[in-house]
Amino acid sequence: MVISAERTNVGFITQVIGPVVDIEFPSGKMPAIYNALRIQGKNAAGLDVAVTCEVQQLLGDNRVRAVAMSSTDGLVRGMEVVDTGAPISVPVGTATLGRIFNVLGEPVDEKGAVNATETLPIHRPAPSFTQLETKPSVFETGIKVIDLLTPYRRGGKIGLFGGAGVGKTVIMMELINNIATQHGGVSVFAGVGERTREGNDLYNEMIESGVIDKDDPSKSKIALVYGQMNEPPGARMRVGLSGLTMAEYFRDVNKQDVLLFIDNIFRFVQAGSEVSALLGRMPSAVGYQPTLGTDVGALQERITSTTEGSITSIQAVYVPADDLTDPAPATTFAHLDGTTVLSRSLAAKGIYPAVDPLGSTSNMLQPDIVGEEHYQTARAVQATLQRYKELQDIIAILGLDELSEEDRLTVARARKIERFLSQPFFVAEVFTGAPGKYVTLEETIKGFQMILSGELDDLPEQAFYMVGNIEEAKAKAEKLKA
């Protein structure tokens, strides 16, 4: 939220080039880089115009070049510009929960003003080395497939890959629900350069599933910050920082565990590339900005665990033309601790969450971090599923009967594992009617060990579908027998 500035430093517009505005100030009164500038006046039609810009370059001759955070329609040369003397600041604290904001921290959900007592600037340094939590610890999500095969690091960054309609949103909402109920944490969702319709759908789905309480927003579990596709590149480039600033307050002041969702991290890079070209910088590889690594690093280095609390970030990653060597995803990968890949073939089988157990990775899956038992169980599950995958062509051509006894047993266990990796979600209760399940890591490991050891070879595979822990699978098998 840009506070109405005192008119101590006033300049005027000298040039407008799309979303970029050049402004001249009196000699000796140049605003600092990243300062917010406020332009207010009337356009040619006599209508009020109010635009906030951010200083990006000092051009010399008392002129600065700034990037607008909203449309520059109606701006004319000679219009007055007020230097606010500070960067863009956004409201922070529990008053932000259940509300939707734009890049400037202004509410856009037509629910009135926000009762936040504090605002913070969106440009802040990353925590110092002495404040960081150095011991890696696993962040339990209660989702079996994630906790077993791609454990999330507390304060880590996870890339979420998946096409349309494979369940990205549902996984996000389940994580938001679980961090609130099991960890007493909150979430912040930064919608960076995605479709307005999707933002609206997400908000309505969150109300339906109880993540947002429409009647009493303070009971909500999430704050939303949107900068959609139709916004100028300045807004799309900065909205990620606005969301991150809100998350940092929950971590540093409220000392909570925070989940920060960024959808989509590629659009953040894309917006930076547009702004870079508008500012006249020489493009780098594939037309990206020369400061690509710095821009991504400035955002990513602030997402971390401190000794007080943590920000664990889940970032949807769009891969242009499926080219993983493109500079935008390649730069992002350098910061990720793990990847959660969603598979359309699993979704088609009705196995939700449709996380690909062989395609997803995590650098937390090491015996010295998760323990020998967890590590060996996860690797055995992956080996069984990999063998099943190799045998599928033979099964398709010759049938199951042509397999050796050992391979038939592997296939039977793999099919049970595949089904046991599914589970009913709390946020999907309203659609499926099945109560959601939170499964602890201990129960998850125990369940898969029992399947691998052959203890449950006599149970039908449908008993493992859409259940929580292994005891529920046994109970379901008893029911199926009856």
Swiss-Prot record:
PROSITE patterns: ATPASE_ALPHA_BETA. SMART domains: AAA. ATP binds at residues 162-169. It holds the Pfam family ATP-synt_ab_N. GO terms for cellular component: plasma membrane-derived thylakoid membrane; proton-transporting ATP synthase complex. Inhibited by dicyclohexylcarbodiimide. It is found in: Cellular thylakoid membrane. It catalyses: ATP + H2O + 4 H(+)(in) = ADP + phosphate + 5 H(+)(out). GO terms for molecular function: ATP binding; ATP hydrolysis activity; proton-transporting ATP synthase activity, rotational mechanism. Keywords: ATP synthesis, ATP-binding, CF(1), Hydrogen ion transport, Ion transport, Membrane, Nucleotide-binding, Thylakoid, Translocase, Transport. It comes from the Bacteria. Its EC number is 7.1.2.2. InterPro entries: AAA+_ATPase, ATP-synt_VA_C, ATP_synth_F1_bsu, ATPase_a/bsu_AS, ATPase_alpha/beta_chains, ATPase_F1/V1/A1_a/bsu_N, ATPase_F1/V1/A1_a/bsu_N_sf, ATPase_F1/V1/A1_a/bsu_nucl-bd. Optimum temperature is 55 degrees Celsius, activity was detected from 4 to 95 degrees Celsius. It is a peripheral membrane protein. Produces ATP from ADP in the presence of a proton gradient across the membrane. The catalytic sites are hosted primarily by the beta subunits. Belongs to the ATPase alpha/beta chains family. F-type ATPases have 2 components, CF(1) - the catalytic core - and CF(0) - the membrane proton channel. CF(1) has five subunits: alpha(3), beta(3), gamma(1), delta(1), epsilon(1). CF(0) has four main subunits: a(1), b(1), b'(1) and c(9-12). This is ATP synthase subunit beta. The gene is atpD.
